[in-house]
């Protein structure tokens, strides 16, 4: 019996070999983990897990992470392997089914990391525990690192924690965005300051769109962010893949007069920092085109004061005045006459009579445009578009316009046009300096009177 051996099957021998290899690997992993902990404060780009992360769909783990239950987290996450697991969530989302011909609920799996969940919800103590257990600071499970989510959700305490433990301030997401790109709300200002103090690059561009943090802040009207980036060396001349500057982004992001105050403040800072008001993108759309298309009179006047040209055309052949006329119907709760008067005062040519139909139901704006002609042109292009109730409310103006169709205007009006022609694009600035009575100055600048004289 002593010379005999127990008969092992081939599958048993293979299982024993795999188990021996697993034990050897586990010994190497533990040794590497101990060495990593000893050098945690030193930059170590090779400090990655040696084997694939395990996935977790355990509801208990999900509840602890998403609710910020620190006591439960301390029980569930006691080693590096647990701290670096992949957390999977499944949610039903509407997706179009070409085969069935209608929208159906389709399960979609999302992956993220425990540390990312904690910092995205502002659970600083939970995040600290995960980091102390060995959670990778710059892991991009699901496309973003923890620092991206902390900035996107504006949690400065979590941002400070991550940076203190060595998170990279310029870590890039799968979309090529840095954490500074994701400081997109007023509340994220402190996050942006912390990133810059940690060495974040203010001029880094995303991979595909090539937007910089300055583009993002300007587009959202974040005037304090814009000021911060400019103080830290942001370049106002950098362009996106579409050729847009930060000033273009600020003017394009001002969606209507109601949101233009913040964007106007951001644009003012950019102009004072040397931004070119004439810089056009690939479609030859200038900042002034964008401001006029959004109906932002104050923003347009700011650009005009800094040298924007009201006569330049974009790729479609439209001037800023054309863009403003097309925006009248899209933004009814504004005063288009202010924008039209500013464009005319800075040298814009009178619009083609066919374009007057766009502001037929805005009598004050229509009056400004009609007073830019030596005589009132044919009213046929716009008279049919006037709403009956509006005609009744402003009958005095509409009747006066019809009565003056192709008729000689007063000598006073012709003199006004002659003075305006002489002053050219400096009409508004010159009128402010001339010693004129207020009523005469308003008349020179096409002030609204309520009727065509």
Curated annotation (Swiss-Prot):
The cross-references to PROSITE patterns, in alphabetical order and at most eight, read: ANK_REP_REGION, ANK_REPEAT, SOCS
What does the UniProt keyword field contain? ANK repeat, Repeat, Ubl conjugation pathway
Where is each SOCS box domain found?
397-453
Per the record, the GO terms for biological process are: intracellular signal transduction; protein ubiquitination
Please give the Pfam families that the UniProt record associates with this protein: Ank (PF00023), Ank_2 (PF12796), Ank_5 (PF13857), SOCS_box (PF07525)
Q: Where are the ANK repeats?
A: 56-85, 110-139, 142-171, 175-204, 209-238, 242-279, 283-312
Metabolic or biological pathway, per its Swiss-Prot or TrEMBL entry: Protein modification; protein ubiquitination
Its domain comment says: The SOCS box domain mediates the interaction with the Elongin BC complex, an adapter module in different E3 ubiquitin-protein ligase complexes.
Q: What does this protein do?
A: May be a substrate-recognition component of a SCF-like ECS (Elongin-Cullin-SOCS-box protein) E3 ubiquitin-protein ligase complex which mediates the ubiquitination and subsequent proteasomal degradation of target proteins.
Family assignment from sequence similarity: Belongs to the ankyrin SOCS box (ASB) family.
- Spell out the PANTHER family in the cross-references: ANK_REP_REGION DOMAIN-CONTAINING PROTEIN, SOWAH (DROSOPHILA) HOMOLOG
Q: What is this protein called?
A: Ankyrin repeat and SOCS box protein 16
Q: Which gene encodes it?
A: Asb16
């Amino acid at each position: 019996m002593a010379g005999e051996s127990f008969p092992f099957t081939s599958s048993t021998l293979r299982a024993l070999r795999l188990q021996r290899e697993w034990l050897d690997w586990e010994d190497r992993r533990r040794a590497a983990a101990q060495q990593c902990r000893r050098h945690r404060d030193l930059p170590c780009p090779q400090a990655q897990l040696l084997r694939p992360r395990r996935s977790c769909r355990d509801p208990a783990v999900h509840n602890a992470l998403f609710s910020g239950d620190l006591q439960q987290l301390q029980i569930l996450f006691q080693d590096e392997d647990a701290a670096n697991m992949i957390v999977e969530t499944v949610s039903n989302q509407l997706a179009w089914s070409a085969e069935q011909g209608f929208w159906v609920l389709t399960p979609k799996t999302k992956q993220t990391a425990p540390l990312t969940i904690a910092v995205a919800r502002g659970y600083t103590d939970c995040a600290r525990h995960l980091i102390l257990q060995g959670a990778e600071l710059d892991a991009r499970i699901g496309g973003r690192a923890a620092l991206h989510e902390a900035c996107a959700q504006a949690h400065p305490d979590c941002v400070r924690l991550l940076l203190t433990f060595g998170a990279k301030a310029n870590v890039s997401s799968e979309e090529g965005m840095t954490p500074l790109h994701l400081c997109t709300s007023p509340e994220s200002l402190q996050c942006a300051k912390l990133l810059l103090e940690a060495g974040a690059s203010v001029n880094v561009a995303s991979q595909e769109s090539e937007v910089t943090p300055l583009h993002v802040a300007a587009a959202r009207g974040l005037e304090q962010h814009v000021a911060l980036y400019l103080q830290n060396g942001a370049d106002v001349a950098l362009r996106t893949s579409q050729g847009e500057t930060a000033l273009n982004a600020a003017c394009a992001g001002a969606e209507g007069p109601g949101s233009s105050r913040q964007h106007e403040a951001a644009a003012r800072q950019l102009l004072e920092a040397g931004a070119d008001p004439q810089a056009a993108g690939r479609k030859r759309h200038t900042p002034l085109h964008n401001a006029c298309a959004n109906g932002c009179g104050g923003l347009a006047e700011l650009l005009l004061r800094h040298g924007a040209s009201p006569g330049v055309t974009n790729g479609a052949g439209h001037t800023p005045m054309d863009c403003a006329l097309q925006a009248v119907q899209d933004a009814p709760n504004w005063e288009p006459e202010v924008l039209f008067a500013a464009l005319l005062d800075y040298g814009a040519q009178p619009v083609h009579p066919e374009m007057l139909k766009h502001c037929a139901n805005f009598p004050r704006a229509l009056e400004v445009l009609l007073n830019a002609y030596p005589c009132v042109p044919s009213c046929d292009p716009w008279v049919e578009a006037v709403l009956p109730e509006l005609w009744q409310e402003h009958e005095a103006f509409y009747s006066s316009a019809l009565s003056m169709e192709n008729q000689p205007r007063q000598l006073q009006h012709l003199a006004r046009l002659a003075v305006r022609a002489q002053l050219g694009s400096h009409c508004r600035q010159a009128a402010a300096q001339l010693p004129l009575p207020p009523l005469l100055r308003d008349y020179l600048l096409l002030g609204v009177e309520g009727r065509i004289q």
